[in-house]
Amino acid sequence: MATTTLGGADYAAAVAAPGIVLVDVRTARSGSSRAFTAVFEAAARRHPDLRFAAVDADAEAALAAELGVRSAPTLMVYRDGVLVFAEPGWLPGDSVDLLVATVRDLDMAAVVAQYPEPLPRRPG
């Protein structure tokens, strides 16, 4: 599945959807963001059953600030509307695949039971 672009108006609904949503918060001026974009797009092709989305942190500065993003790229992963991963920096392709497998295997009932309130935002 192709990567979609999210903005402030559609972000909340997109990440609240059932299933797994990976979000790359990126900026065009960051070399690391540009490098991770290729990795992220390739992962999207390998996992067409998942939703891959990007947020342009320059164009959506208010959204990036609301999410607590302080550096790009930052990868955020939601499952069934729950933020289960958020880290700054880029991952190689095999690490993205391992992360996808880990998120697929999560026992979401246990996650929600242990963390009934959303975790504080802390991406870099």
Residue ranges and their predicted role:
Residues 33:
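Conserved phosphotransfer microenvironments
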Residues 3-7, 25-27, 37-62, 72:
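Thiol-based oxidoreductase modules, predominantly thioredoxin-like and allied folds used
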Residues 63-72, 78-80, 84:
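Structural alpha/beta surface segment adjacent to cysteine/selenocysteine redox centers
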Residues 3-20:
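A short beta-strand-turn-helix
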Residues 13-14, 63-66, 99, 108-124:
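CheY-like receiver
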Residues 79-112:
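Non-catalytic, surface beta->alpha helical segment in thiol-disulfide oxidoreductase systems
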Residues 16-30:
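Short active-site neighborhood of thiol/selenol oxidoreductases, capturing the structured segment around
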